[in-house]
């Protein structure tokens, strides 16, 4: 089965090139880094990567005079369709490299949490983080510490995957959530032990994998450890024939609170002048179809209410503003005006990395992607003690959604009419106590579940 997949990946190589070209044309690829999709670029011995310090032309390792430069000869290992290369043991011991693969934004936040906490226990470990999307790349590039570097994940083809692994020679691989690239995982397991952490399978993917159960098992047998995020996910893995997975809970509970620039927060809070902010976070077009029609009604009822919208993909800002005009709404983007125009109907935040700032001033936050995309991360808003609302589709975050609802830490709505009804109810002054209770319960829910991090670290560090 795997050989068939490899053969298809060769045959479909021209299609991969076309897909990358299309993604480039529609702005989903970074032309400055397009070569990384083909494993061309940086590598473990790159002179420009001071964080590894294993290159033969370095005079010494910074901060540690006991580790002097030595010239190493790569060891060639012939396997199957090609060769892999490894550093001799004494070289790889100098700086162990953990490779973390994070598909998109949510997984990238988990990667940052792992890096921060693993490096506390093992300060000499260095990190390579791969991801697929432009949005995750921007966040990781901005937030990664000096002990880590980001690269785009190459196309899942044996040529590019083996080249990537030769370039980086990781000592441990950690895949987050549901990134199951067959070639990458199969070849990666030849280089180092692989862990699948915070693993989950959406209901849609589960149905698809049931038709390909043997292939699913073939991929997952390459993982030395599989840690799932819920009992439901554990059941799914078991039904797919993976019997050695364990459930430690959702590591997103351990993600650090989103950063906030305090100077910007003071300026924004002063500017908003005690207005009650309703934030629509990580929205998609399907969310905006529901949200935009109710804004006028909301603003007319509550003069002290201000609407802020943060699209999941900021590059959509022009189309959102056009949609606002079609609904007779006035809107300004942050790229146009650094502070909200209070006379407008809404303010659109089209910059990455500022979600924490706007959660800080929000009273109520609607979590986007919850009408058709399976929902985004509820917990980020909970850290800021927001009253949380989400739509009917939380299929990608089923257990967290169930947990917050059971603890009266969030509200689920069915449609646009229901959303308007709930917002109207919460914003009425005589319901202020109930609004405060939801906000307090959201923060308590986070704090009650944070012990999960230590359990994950205890498992992961056994492989270091």
Curated annotation (Swiss-Prot):
Highest taxon of the lineage: Bacteria
Binding site for CMP: 311-312, 352-354, 377-380
Pathways involved: Bacterial outer membrane biogenesis; LPS core biosynthesis
Bilayer topology: Single-pass membrane protein
Catalytic residues, chain numbering: 107
EC class name: transferase
Subcellular location field: Cell inner membrane
One Pfam family, short name: Glycos_transf_N
Any one GO molecular function term: Kdo transferase activity
Domain named RPE1 insert: residues: 47-93
Site (Transition state stabilizer): 177, 252
EC number(s) from the headed UniProt entry: 2.4.99.12
Record-linked SUPFAM superfamilies: UDP-Glycosyltransferase/glycogen phosphorylase (SSF53756)
Keywords: Cell inner membrane, Cell membrane, Lipopolysaccharide biosynthesis, Membrane, Signal-anchor, Transferase, Transmembrane, Transmembrane helix
Catalyses which reaction(s): lipid IVA (E. coli) + CMP-3-deoxy-beta-D-manno-octulosonate = alpha-Kdo-(2->6)-lipid IVA (E. coli) + CMP + H(+)
InterPro entries given in the database record: Glycos_transf_N, Glycos_transf_N_sf, Kdotransferase, RPE1
Main location: membrane
Sequence intervals crossing the membrane: 2-22
Swiss-Prot/TrEMBL GO biological process terms: lipid A biosynthetic process; lipopolysaccharide core region biosynthetic process
Gene Ontology CC annotation, any one: plasma membrane
Function: Involved in lipopolysaccharide (LPS) biosynthesis. Catalyzes the transfer of 3-deoxy-D-manno-octulosonate (Kdo) residue(s) from CMP-Kdo to lipid IV(A), the tetraacyldisaccharide-1,4'-bisphosphate precursor of lipid A.
Family assignment from sequence similarity: Belongs to the glycosyltransferase group 1 family. Glycosyltransferase 30 subfamily.
Protein name: 3-deoxy-D-manno-octulosonic acid transferase
UniProt source species: Rickettsia conorii (strain ATCC VR-613 / Malish 7)
Lineage: Bacteria, Pseudomonadati, Pseudomonadota, Alphaproteobacteria, Rickettsiales
């Amino acid at each position: 089965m795997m050989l068939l997949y490899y053969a298809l990946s060769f045959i479909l190589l021209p299609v991969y090139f076309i897909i990358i070209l299309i993604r480039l044309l529609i702005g989903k690829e970074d032309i400055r880094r397009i070569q990384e999709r083909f494993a061309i670029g940086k590598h473990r011995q790159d002179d420009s990567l001071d964080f590894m310090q294993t290159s033969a032309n370095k005079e010494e390792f910074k901060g540690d005079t006991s580790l002097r430069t030595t010239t190493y000869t790569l060891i060639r290992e012939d396997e199957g369709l090609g060769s892999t290369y490894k550093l001799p043991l004494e070289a790889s011991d100098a700086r162990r490299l953990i490779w973390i693969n994070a598909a998109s934004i949510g997984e990238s936040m988990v990667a940052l949490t792992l890096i921060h906490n693993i490096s506390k226990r093992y300060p000499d470990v260095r990190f390579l983080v791969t991801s697929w999307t432009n949005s995750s790349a921007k966040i990781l590039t901005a937030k990664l510490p000096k002990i880590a570097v980001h690269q785009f994940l190459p196309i899942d083809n044996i040529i590019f995957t083996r080249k990537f692994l030769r370039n980086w020679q990781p000592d441990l691989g950690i895949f987050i959530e549901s990134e199951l690239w067959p070639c990458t995982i199969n070849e990666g397991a030849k280089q180092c032990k692989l862990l699948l952490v915070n693993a989950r399978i959406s209901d849609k993917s589960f149905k698809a994998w049931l038709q390909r159960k043997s292939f699913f098992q073939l991929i997952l047998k390459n993982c030395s450890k599989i840690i799932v995020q819920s009992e439901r996910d554990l059941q799914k893995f078991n039904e797919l024939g993976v019997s050695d997975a364990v459930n430690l809970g959702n590591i997103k509970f351990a993600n650090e609170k989103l950063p906030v620039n305090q100077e910007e927060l003071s300026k924004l809070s002063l500017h908003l002048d005690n207005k009650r902010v309703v934030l629509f976070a990580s929205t998609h077009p399907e969310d905006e179809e529901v949200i935009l029609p109710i804004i006028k009604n909301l603003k007319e009822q509550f003069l002290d209410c201000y609407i802020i919208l943060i699209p999941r993909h900021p590059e959509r800002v022009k189309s959102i503003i056009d949609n606002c005009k079609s609904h007779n709404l006035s809107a300004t983007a942050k790229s146009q005006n650094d502070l909200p125009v209070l006379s407008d109907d809404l303010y659109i935040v089209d910059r990455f990395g500022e979600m924490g700032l706007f959660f800080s001033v929000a009273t109520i936050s609607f979590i986007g992607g919850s009408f058709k995309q399976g929902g985004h991360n509820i917990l980020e808003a909970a850290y800021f003690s927001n009253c949380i609302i989400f739509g009917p589709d939380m299929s990608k975050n089923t257990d967290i959604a169930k947990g917050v609802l059971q603890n009266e830490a969030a509200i689920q709505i069915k449609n646009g009419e229901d959303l308007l009804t709930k917002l109207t109810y919460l914003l009425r002054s005589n319901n202020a106590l109930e609004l405060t209770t939801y906000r307090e319960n959201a923060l308590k829910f986070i704090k009650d579940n944070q012990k999960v991090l230590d359990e994950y670290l205890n498992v992961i560090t056994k492989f270091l």
